[in-house]
Each structure stands twice: as structure tokens, then as C-alpha cells.
Amino acid sequence: MKTLGVFILLSWLSTSFAFAQQNEQQKDTIQKLDEVTVSAQQILGSKFQARNRTGSAYYISPQEIQKMGYTDINRMLKAVPGVNVYEEDGYGLRPNISLRGTKAERSEKITLMEDGILAAPAPYAAPAAYYFPNAARMQAVEVVKGSSQVQYGPFTTGGAINMVSTAIPTKFSAKLSASSGTNNTLKTHINAGDSKKHFGYMVEYLRYQSDGFKHFENKQNAGFKRNDLIAKFKVNTAKTEGANHSFELKAGYADEDSNETYVGLTQSDFARTPFLRYVGSQKDHLTTRHTQWVGTYLLQFSNRLKFTTHFYYNTFFRNWYKLESVKYGTSANEKRTIGQILADPETNAPYFDILSGKTDSRVFYNDYERLKDNPGLFVRANYRNYFSRGVQTKAEYKAIWGNCYLDNEWGLRYHTDEEDRNQWDDIYAMKNQQMQLLWKGLQGSQANKITRANALAAYWLSKLTYKQLTVTAGLRFEHIELLEKDYTTADTRRTGQKRIETTNVANAVIPSLGLHYNLTDWLSAFAGIHKGFSPPGVSKEKRVMDRNGNITLLTENQKPESSINFEAGLRVNYKQLKTEVIGFYNHYSNMLGSDLAAMGGTGTLEQFNVGEAVVKGAEFIAQYQPFPEESPIKTPLQLSYTFTDTEMKNSFESNSWGRVIAGDEIPYINRHSLNLSIGAEYKKYELNIGIRYNGAVRTEPGQGLIAERHKIPAYTIIDVAAKAHFARRFTLTLNAINLTNRTYLVSRHPSGLRPGHPLGIFGGIIYKVN
């Protein structure tokens, strides 16, 4: 804890210096600090703040979100440079997001937040984001990268994404948004709220459902249904001189009921019928429930000094019941995973024929004790419970003397999260393209363990502005304790007769330095350097305990992910033109990978050391409005481009990536991606067009030309949104995604080829009262 003591000392010295300088000012001098008001739930709050940081940042404003009316976070983020995403289900329900070349799978290497609170089910113990906040109910999305992100952890290599939910309005307002369209896709979004002198409230409900664009030959539904309910209530003192207090309580509930699967298609079937679902996935079903409770206390003495404290408790349950493998004979070696079957359907033809329903599986044993030895389809219940809870607080102090402005921020968070895995396999026979239950598995017979993390995080950030120069220095500290209790599949009741305890402890000091200089009234330059960090998994020390309490120690070594990251860029803000160009270079001394079923691994979620790696690239964005502000015609244009180059420096083998050779690229990272947005606004009418280009992507580690079997070809997708405003309250909307109805491949994982969303057309209404 010596490091934490140094951290506190540095913070105290910066505070003392600021107070001393302020006290030297003349008492009769009236000073005013101009600031952009940012709510306690936001980290940027405006495009102005994003453009004036010493590091890279982007603010997707409410106006931007409303233009295209997206419900898919993948489409929402497409305009942000430095962001890589690859689709999975076509609706953005469980996105795979990478920031500056971090691993994209389940967005597990970014700091994901909702209203400033960690949002992944168990961000330290099991960071894969199987829960992602519903983008359709967000009023803004904030993305910070590079040296801008030292306040936000634990993942500091690529960046952080903060989903900003609907705020309590300053006066009464209500909104109804409803749409319907292709594949019986329906969305209903309602919110209402008000504020009085000493209290305010907001309630919100979102219903989102679809029959899905994939289909079974027997017309079985392949869609989903989602519900989101949010309520906020705030009490506050009058905003007068002296200390002001406010307390806001946020409660949320969300659930999902979907027929989503990990089963994709063979190469030949994708070419013929890209939206087909094999009958072997007819029992695949996902059920989730999520709750959140957040209490936010704000104490503000003045515009210069305020304290914000959050208390939070989140729970998440999910049971993804999905096909795991197929067994053709009675012996154990006559069993193949879905990934193996779809990767080579010719060699595994007997297994594929059962999966696709071309042939029935055989039943050799009818007595109860031998039923589980029969051939058939093994469907795994991926039954998991999560919770995360904690308290985080920050203090902000602003001082001014002469031409110098000093902003100080200190933060502290104590956090606990847990994942409870209790999984089993059921066995089905295939008969006349219908799956019939043969054997009901025992809960806990496939995975039976609890992983818990306790984490203490603290940070200090100081921003000094002198004339045209801004210098930002920061320091973050992370102390993480991990414990896994594996009760083993032999002790499904968790009696404790035998369990394997795995522990790990990680400490990290994460410094950050950023510079921003206004070269002219319209041109500025910035640069930054910071340390990247990602928590390790629980695989350092294993304690095997028998029924007599005897412990056997086994040791392994897993280090945290660590990197040194550089960035430099220029910003132009000239009349109606705003541009930004950035170069970045991330040098990993140790990169971590994960054994995820979503990547075709075994699904243990255990992390492995990749070792040294380099990710470098460039980001560009330009925004232009040809017509002056007072013109009745608006034609906003935006172009963004990202180039990313990755290289792993070590050779190794893993369940997810197989054999990796030094020099291989990281899979599922776009080398080139480009987005163009074109808008036209005149009086009551709006038309917005989004054009997205994704270059070819490699789905397995490799180098040189991409082999066809490991390739996602380049594609261009066009989306269009039109609006007509009638009176002040009523709007008609018409949206089309994938306007040209292009059939395109988005992934070869977890098992087989998966298509992107085909043409979708949706009409709707928006009704507002305010």
C-alpha cells in the first residue's frame, strides 16, 4: 500500500498549492469561472468538452442519436473513429466492441459504464459483457480514449464507453416513440418526467421485439423480446448561496426472452440460404434478467468545489440454453463440437446430417441408467448469476490565479463483483426434424464454480491551463483480489467435500500525461502518453482442498495486461469546418486473451498470456456544414476513417485462437473502416444517409494475405432515415437499414458463418409534450 500513500501525498500537495494560490488573491476581486455544466452521470456532457480534452474523445449527442433513430449500438458507434465492432445477431443485443485494437469479443477489454457506473455483469471477475445497456433508451453516448481516460477503469488500454440514460427533465415533458416494420419488428419507447423546486422524477419504459431475420424451415420463431423499465427520483435543496445538496435514486429492470443461437452455417449453405437456421438449434433459447439500483449524492459548495458519491448494486441472471455438440455413436470419441462440425462438414458428415435434420439420431439404450450414453444433440444450459456492488466518490476543485486555471479531481471506488456458474447438458434425439428430450442433465455437472473480485481503485487528475497551453496529469491505482471456488462437477450440491480454490492479486499504478496547445484561433495540437492496464484472471495460485481439509498448492503465473500508449493529433475548428486527425501507438508488454465460447473456445472464460504485441494506427474525422447557421437549409456532412495495424510478437497456443505465430495479426480488428454521413434539413423535413465501409477482416490469427476460410470480405452498407415534423409535437419517421439489401458476412464465430441484417424498413411516430 506504499504506492497508495504516495498517490495520496501527490493529491494533497496539488490541493494545498491550489488553495494557497487562491488565498493570495485580493479579497475584493470578483472572479468567475466559466464552465460547461456536466451532470453527475456524464463524463463529457457536450461536444465542446470532447473537442477540448488533452486526449481523444467523442460525444454522440441526443441530436445525433435522433437523426438516424438507431436501436443498434454497433450502428450508433460507426461514426466514432478508433472504434472497431463486429456484429453477431444483427440487432446489437450483445455487441463486440474494440477501442484502438483491443480484443473485441464481448467488449471485455473496454470500461463499459451506464451513467458513470460499471455496467458489465462482473467487470473484474468475469468482464465479458453478456449484458449491454439497451442503446435504444440512451440520450447520449460518450467515448474516451488515450490519456483522456485515467479516471475510468479498470480497463485503460483502449478506452471507456459511457451510456448516458434519459435524465430527469428540468420541466414537465413526455415522449412517445413507436415504430414497426420488417420481420414484425416493434419498438415502443415512453418516458415522462418533471422537476419542481425541491424534487424531480422520470419514468421510462422500452419494449423492443422482432421475429428475427433468420428462419427455420418449419417456420419456428427465431426472434426476441426485450423490456426495459427505468425510474428516477431526486430531492434537492434550493439552489441558493452556500452548500447545495441533492440525492437521486435510480431503479432499473430489464429482461430478454430470445431464441438466439451460437450455431451458424457452413460455407456452402451460407452461399445458398444465408438466413437459414439449422433444426438442431430449435431448442436454443436465452433468458436474462437485470436489475440496477443507484443512489447519487451531490454536495456542491460553489462552482469551484463539489463532491459526488454513487452507491450501486446490480444483478444479472442469464441462462443461455444452446446446442453445444453432437454425438453420432456411443463412444466418447464419437462426439464433435458445433464449431468442428461446421468448419468441416464433409469429414463430419454424420454429425452434420443430425444437426441439419437430414437424418435421425439413433437410440441404442432405453434403460434410464444408459440413456445418457446414446447418440444425440447435447444442449448446454449456460446458467449464470452475477452481481456487482460498490461505492465510488469523487471530489472536484477549481482554482484560478492570474492567467492560470487549475482543475483537480480525486476519486475513490470500492467494488465487489461475482459470477456464479452452474451449468449442465441435456441430451436430445433428432427424429423427423424434431428434437426429443432423452436425458435431463444434473445442474452443475458441466461447470460449478463461483468467482469473486474485490477491488479498490483511486485516481487523481489535475488540469492546468495557462493561456494557450493545457497540461493534464493523472495517476490511477488499482488493487484487485480475485478468488475462484470450483466445487467441481463431482460435487454438484456444493457440499464442500472437495473444491479447488484459485487466487490472484494484482496491483497497478497507472500514470497519464496529456498536453493541448492552441496554435491559432482555429488550430490546436495535442499529445498524450499513458499506461494501459487490464486485470488478470484467477490463475496464479491454486489450492486443492480435500474432504479432510488438506490443501495442495499449485502455482501458475498470470500477469495483468500492461502497455504503454502514445497518441498525438491536430484539431481544426474553422468556421463551419471541424476536423481531427490522430495517430496512436500502443505497445503491450503483455496482452491477455480469453477462452470465450463466443470466439469458438471452450467457454471457461480463463485468460491466457499473449505476451508482447503492438497496435498502431490513425483516426480521422471531419464535420462540415456548408450553409451558415441562419440558413433555412442545412446539409451536415461527416466523414470518419480508422486505420488499425496489429501484430503479436510471441508464438503460443490457446483454445480460442489455436496456434499463433509471432507476427500474426489480432483477429476481428478492421484494418480499414470508413463512415460517411450526409444530411439534408429544410423546414419540417429531414433526410439523413449513413454509408459504412468495413474492410476485409481476418477471423483467425495470421499474417499476409487472408485465407478465404478465415476471411470476412469487405462490404459497404447504406442506412437512410427520413422525418417529417408536423406542428410542434408530432413527427413521422421512416427508416431503412441496409438499403441495397446486401447479403454480407459479419462473423465466422462462435460456430459457423453468420449474416448481417438484410433490408429492414420501419415506419413510426414520435409525440412529445413539453
Task: Go through the PLM ranges and name each one.
Residues 74-121:
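Extracytoplasmic beta-strand/coil segments of soluble accessory domains associated
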Residues 117-145:
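Short acidic/polar hinge/loop motifs at secondary-structure boundaries
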Residues 465, 578, 583-589, 604-701, ...:
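Gram-negative outer-membrane beta-barrel transporters
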Residues 257-259, 263-273, 481-493, 503, ...:
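Surface-exposed extracellular loop regions of Gram-negative outer-membrane beta-barrel proteins
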Residues 35-68, 93-96:
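N-terminal periplasmic "start-of-domain" segments of outer-membrane beta-barrel proteins
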Residues 180-209, 218-261, 285-289, 295-302, ...:
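Transmembrane beta-barrel wall of Gram-negative outer-membrane proteins
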Residues 300, 306-312, 316-320, 324, ...:
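Membrane-embedded beta-barrel scaffold of Gram-negative outer-membrane proteins
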Residues 378, 405-520:
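Signature of Gram-negative outer-membrane beta-barrel scaffolds
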